[in-house]
Amino acid sequence: MPSINAQLHHVNVTVPKSAEDAAKHFYATVLGLREVSKPEESRGRGGAWYQLGGMQLHLSIEDGLSEKCLSKRHICYTVNDLSVAEEQFRRAGVEIIPDDLPTRGWARFYVRDPGGNRLEIAQAV
């Protein structure tokens, strides 16, 4: 079967309207992602788009979501210094969720954004 040469362009996470401002602060300020302009036809829908290296994270508003949609599904962000990242999250008042299943070659912890989305923060060791 021939390859379709698929590449990851963006990941979309959703939060309830009530968490939109806190989520924007979380991704732009706490995580340090660079916000990019959305296409005009998407601007009236709320949320924000962020550039992350060669891909994007799209933050969308979804009606009917509970305040915390707890699940183990997650997006993994790699960092150069896990202890610096952990301290930055703690200073921002973000709860650190310890790694409950250590994986050889990686040090990591988890956090949740204001909409309840789970993020893995990892460093190769």
Features from the language model and the residues they span:
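Hydrophobic side chains in well-ordered alpha-helices
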Residues: 23, 85-88
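Exposed loop/turn and edge beta-strand positions of beta-sandwich/beta-sheet ligand-binding modules
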Residues: 44, 71, 105
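Helix N-cap motif at beta-to-alpha junctions
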Residues: 19, 80-82
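N-terminal beta-strand motif that seeds the catalytic metal site of vicinal oxygen chelate
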Residues: 1-24, 73-75
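Short amphipathic alpha-helices in soluble, non-transmembrane regions
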Residues: 29, 88-92
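Core segments of cupin and vicinal oxygen chelate
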Residues: 13-56
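Vicinal oxygen chelate
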Residues: 1-6, 91-125
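Short, charged/polar, Gly/Pro-enriched secondary-structure boundary elements
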Residues: 54-58, 116-119
